[in-house]
């Protein structure tokens, strides 16, 4: 094959015309040292705090420390392939994660990459993980209920949309179970749920995902997982990644719920990073800004005012205590940031009272305004009744003779405790809760044996659903107990009692 001379010259001319000189400038540096997920980099003089740097092999790192002669970088992945002398490139970008409906139903890592084997994530929008919380003017007070389906919480420590309610307790007291029930209860509310697993075992996260899938809740839930085997920087950043994904719905006028399981492990990961970055340690060796670590995260949960779309983000952070010590550093920090706490106690758990909620120590500081009127009417005195019952039960142990009124309070209290027990993964609709609380607090269960209370409640609710569905529907729509509903409910319970056999 011969090419003519004029053809060669034509090809060369075309090549010259299409040649474009492109100079790409990037500021580079060199790795001084690396270990435990932290790298020291020399030479990137203009790097900014929280900026991403690119290491060999595409590994990203986030700038945390800016010092005179080098920068401290948290590596967002395994550091095994990085060695001293490796080149590092500035990206000029802030760490961002995918947001939008595409993340729903997926299990992601803190970088927003899918780890569930269901194919790539086709996200159209990305947002930075560190965003400013809404200001004072942008907010509105909490006034809409966010039912959890758990009787003890919805009656005595109600949660509203936009609230931060801490779930606190020792290990193995059912903290995660409470939060999973809260997710299951959102099936028909349109609230999007996000579950952030920080420092959990992989088996635990797999079990949570499996449970949500089994109950049909995975379609409106996203799991962000930074397990115990992940490097500390990923455990630290995972909560912010999840928050950014959830905020997307708050900002477009929808409602979202986010669960951080748990912030104790996030604080431990942050402590590890801070000590490796040679930041000065404070109380319990945590760095001085560990309060800010949690406050800037939890302040992003808010009820937004009507002019900004009236969306909300509700947060349920979990804190694990050691031997019930709520006065330790991290628990007191998070208690002071949140709008109340649900305290779970091992003694109650072991006594078979599950969920093991200590009513005396649990409180909701803003949820009362969000509680529906019907629930206020039936559960208003419940906390007081239970507190009196606990006090009298301790006194009655001495075996002294009790008068009729005291005995009646003890009997009613024992029935209330029994009524508040609830099986796992069975959240109860609010109208059914109101009906059973009404029967208990108005003395309609006083003649039912304590051991038969749960059977009585289940059969009574079945009776109401099948034969008197109009009563439950009226409670659901009117959200209050007027004289007519009350009379019909009382008559229905009396009718059911005639045929009930303990």
Curated annotation (Swiss-Prot):
InterPro entries: ATP_synth_asu-like_sf, ATP_synth_asu_C, ATP_synth_asu_C_sf, ATP_synth_F1_a_nt-bd_dom, ATP_synth_F1_asu, ATPase_a/bsu_AS, ATPase_F1/V1/A1_a/bsu_N, ATPase_F1/V1/A1_a/bsu_N_sf. Its EC number is 7.1.2.2. It is a peripheral membrane protein. Transmembrane segments: none annotated. It is found in: Cell inner membrane. It catalyses: ATP + H2O + 4 H(+)(in) = ADP + phosphate + 5 H(+)(out). GO terms for molecular function: ADP binding; ATP binding; proton-transporting ATP synthase activity, rotational mechanism. F-type ATPases have 2 components, CF(1) - the catalytic core - and CF(0) - the membrane proton channel. CF(1) has five subunits: alpha(3), beta(3), gamma(1), delta(1), epsilon(1). CF(0) has three main subunits: a(1), b(2) and c(9-12). The alpha and beta chains form an alternating ring which encloses part of the gamma chain. CF(1) is attached to CF(0) by a central stalk formed by the gamma and epsilon chains, while a peripheral stalk is formed by the delta and b chains. Produces ATP from ADP in the presence of a proton gradient across the membrane. The alpha chain is a regulatory subunit. This is ATP synthase subunit alpha. The lineage of its organism: Bacteria, Pseudomonadati, Thermodesulfobacteriota, Desulfovibrionia, Desulfovibrionales.
């Amino acid at each position: 094959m011969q090419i003519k001379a004029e053809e060669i010259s034509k090809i060369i001319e075309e090549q010259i015309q299409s040649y474009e000189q492109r100079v790409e400038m990037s500021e580079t540096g060199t790795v001084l040292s690396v270990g435990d997920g932290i790298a020291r980099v020399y030479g990137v003089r203009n790097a900014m705090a929280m900026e991403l740097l690119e290491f060999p092999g595409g590994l990203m790192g986030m700038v945390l420390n800016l010092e005179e002669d080098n920068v401290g970088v948290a590596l967002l992945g395994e550091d095994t392939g990085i060695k001293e002398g490796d080149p590092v490139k500035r990206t000029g970008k802030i760490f961002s994660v995918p947001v939008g409906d595409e993340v729903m139903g997926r299990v992601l890592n803190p970088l927003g990459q899918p780890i569930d084997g269901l194919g790539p994530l086709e996200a159209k929008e990305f947002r930075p993980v560190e965003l400013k919380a809404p200001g004072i003017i942008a907010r509105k007070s909490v006034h809409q209920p966010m039912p959890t389906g758990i009787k003890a919480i919805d009656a005595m420590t109600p949660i509203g949309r936009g609230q931060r309610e801490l779930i606190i307790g020792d290990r193995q007291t059912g903290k995660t179970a409470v939060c999973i029930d809260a997710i299951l209860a959102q099936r028909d509310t349109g609230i999007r749920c996000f579950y952030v697993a920080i420092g959990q075992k992989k088996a635990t996260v797999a079990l949570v995902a499996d449970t949500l899938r089994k109950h049909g809740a995975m379609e409106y839930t996203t799991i962000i997982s930074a397990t115990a085997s992940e490097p500390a920087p990923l455990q630290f950043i995972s909560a912010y990644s999840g928050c950014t994904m959830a905020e997307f719905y708050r900002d477009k006028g929808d409602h979202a719920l986010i669960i951080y399981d748990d912030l104790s492990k996030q604080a431990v990961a942050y402590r590890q990073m801070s000590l490796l970055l040679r930041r000065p340690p404070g109380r319990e060796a945590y760095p001085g800004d560990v309060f800010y670590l949690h406050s800037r995260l939890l302040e992003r949960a808010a009820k937004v005012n009507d002019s900004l779309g009236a969306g909300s983000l509700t947060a349920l952070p979990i804190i694990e205590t050691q031997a019930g010590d709520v006065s330790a550093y991290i628990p007191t920090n998070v208690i002071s940031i949140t709008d109340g706490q649900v305290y779970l106690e091992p003694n109650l758990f072991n006594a078979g009272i599950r969920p093991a909620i200590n009513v005396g120590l649990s409180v909701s500081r803003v949820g009362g305004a969000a509680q529906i009127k019907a629930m206020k009417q039936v559960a208003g005195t419940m906390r007081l009744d239970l507190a009196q019952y606990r006090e009298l039960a301790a006194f009655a142990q001495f075996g002294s003779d009790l008068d009729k009124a005291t005995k009646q309070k003890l009997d009613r209290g024992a029935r209330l405790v029994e009524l508040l027990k609830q099986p796992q993964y069975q959240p109860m609709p609010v109208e059914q809760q109101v009906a059973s609380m009404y029967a208990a607090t108005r003395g309609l269960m006083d003649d039912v044996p304590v051991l038969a209370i749960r059977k009585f409640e289940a059969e009574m609710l079945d009776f109401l659903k099948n034969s008197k569905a109009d009563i439950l529907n009226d409670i659901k729509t009117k959200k209050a107990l007027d004289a007519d509903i009350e009379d019909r409910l009382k008559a229905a319970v009396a009718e059911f009692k005639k045929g009930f056999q303990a």
